[in-house]
Amino acid sequence: MIIFDEKKYAEDLIKNGYKDKTRIVLDNIILVKYWKYSGLSESEIKKKLEDFMIDFKHRYNSNIIPYHIRKALNQGLRYPLVFDKVVNITQKEIDIINSIDVLELRKVLFVLLVIWKFRDKQKFMISNNNLKKLAKVKCKNSVFWDYLHRLHDLGCLKAFVYKCKPYYKLNIEECGDIVLNIKNYDDIISYYLSMIYPDEYIYCSICGIPIKQTSNRRKYCSSCWKERERELRVTINKRYYEKNKIKTV
């Protein structure tokens, strides 16, 4: 699982708690980074994390809290919180992707490229299911493995094992003019599809992310529409409250 906005992710964690017990170590590191970004001291962060873990101790063995706290502090205090990161894609990179004859392959490679550059061109891990979801590719696992093998054979993708875990790196020439600035990672593949099918896409009136045009009325992406609906509900509720308050006076 790739976390593109650690700030937003940490705020959701604080509000709703752990969602996956297999990610508690990584979640704690992000929480430490978030509280460090918020200006808290190391002792304050330690206390906050301890309280947080106690609140959700039903999700794991509570005897390991001290170990988890030490590990999270050791990692989280060393690195900055990652959010509002922009990935630039060049025309040369798009040309290389477009030289592949199968659209599904191109979609997978584009998403891999974005992740690789988001990771500052370091090796990265991602499950096939997550990669398929981000690339919006629907196929059997055997077919998807064939896609990855073909990208490897084309020289674009390098897969290797490090500490018994599979990692990826890319081999794509970066030169040329920048043609895409990716700022929103809710729908990565829409950036690429909007370039090859420009007549089918418009841009969200709020955040600017490309969105597939399904009707003449559509102006917002899903995330911005949800936020706009929330603001409208708040406004309506406020007016209703004020109206009834006047009646009772």
Each language-model region and where it sits:
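Short, exposed beta-strand "edge-strand" segments with a Pro/Gly-rich flavor and a Y/T-containing core
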Residues: 81-86, 124, 213-220
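Short, cationic low-complexity segments
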Residues: 188-193, 210
